[in-house]
Amino acid sequence: MKAYPFTSTTATTMRQNCGGSLMFNMYLSDPTENLLKESKSPSWTPINTGVQKGSGQIQLWQFLLELLSDSANMTCIAWEGTNGEFKLIDPDEVARRWGERKSKPNMNYDKLSRALRYYYDKNIMTKVHGKRYAYKFDFNGLAQVCQPSSTEQAIYKFQSNFAPIQFSGISKLNLVAPGVGPSGFSYWPGSPPTLYHSHNLQPPGPFGAVSASHLSCVNNINSLNNLNNINNHYN
């Protein structure tokens, strides 16, 4: 059997073939669905940072992705081409469904298209030139729109599933090793202001931001324990 080399062109083609049908799942699925998958308790429930299907609390771009996620809607809207391009096969039907969802019976395609044009400046989607009723999602722009809130909610949900560990137990767990300075000690990857800037949340328990004085005490305790162990060994 003849083997074909895997080139960069092949990789690019594979990515393009996936197109929007793979990328849009980022915005309809739960980003914490697999978080703690192996160890979550029965009371743990995932967060849905988007909206539930059928909900009226939805934006137009989310609604379009919802329609595109169901192959039963291919008679009115469908993916076309690559990299997030889609076409309104029956624009009047799409507009009717959007009006039904938002309780606006007078909705039509003219109004819907004006709403879509609002997304151009937001880098959420663009009109495909030369093709009627064809649009293209900009997933980089969508990521910028969605990521801040979803990340913060996922982190907050993640930390809420853990009981705080008392500070007195840090030295017993040997979490502070010799040579680790205050600036390098952080439970979460990233600085607290970056992760908690919107809600003024504090990092979980003692691990997020332990003061320099606390760290100094713990290091001193560890040093004394090590010294006592050495003395006991020779005595």
Curated annotation (Swiss-Prot):
The answer, when asked if DNA-binding is one of the entry's keywords, is yes
An example of a GO molecular function for this protein is: DNA-binding transcription factor activity, RNA polymerase II-specific
| DNA-binding region, residues | 58-138
Principal subcellular localisation of the protein: nucleus
Checking Gene3D superfamilies in the record gives: Winged helix-like DNA-binding domain superfamily/Winged helix DNA-binding domain (1.10.10.10)
The biological process GO terms on file are: cell differentiation; hematopoietic stem cell differentiation; nervous system development; regulation of DNA-templated transcription; regulation of transcription by RNA polymerase II
Q: What InterPro entries is this protein classified in?
A: Ets_dom (IPR000418), ETS_fam (IPR046328), WH-like_DNA-bd_sf (IPR036388), WH_DNA-bd_sf (IPR036390)
Pfam families attached here?
Answer: Ets
The record ties this protein, via SMART domains, to: ETS (SM00413)
- What keywords sit in the KW lines? Developmental protein, Differentiation, DNA-binding, Neurogenesis, Nucleus, Transcription, Transcription regulation
Q: Which SUPFAM superfamilies match?
A: Winged helix' DNA-binding domain (SSF46785)
Q: Name one GO cellular component term.
A: nucleus
Determine if Nucleotide-binding is one of this entry's keywords. no
Q: According to its UniProt record, in which tissues is this protein expressed? A: Expressed by serotonergic neurons in anterior and posterior raphe.
Q: Where in the cell is it found?
A: Nucleus
UniProt similarity note = Belongs to the ETS family.
- Biological role: Functions as a transcriptional regulator. Functions in the differentiation and the maintenance of the central serotonergic neurons. May play a role in cell growth.
Q: Which PANTHER family match?
A: ETS (PTHR11849), FEV TRANSCRIPTION FACTOR, ETS FAMILY MEMBER (PTHR11849:SF307)
| Name of this chain's protein | Protein FEV
Source organism per UniProt: Danio rerio
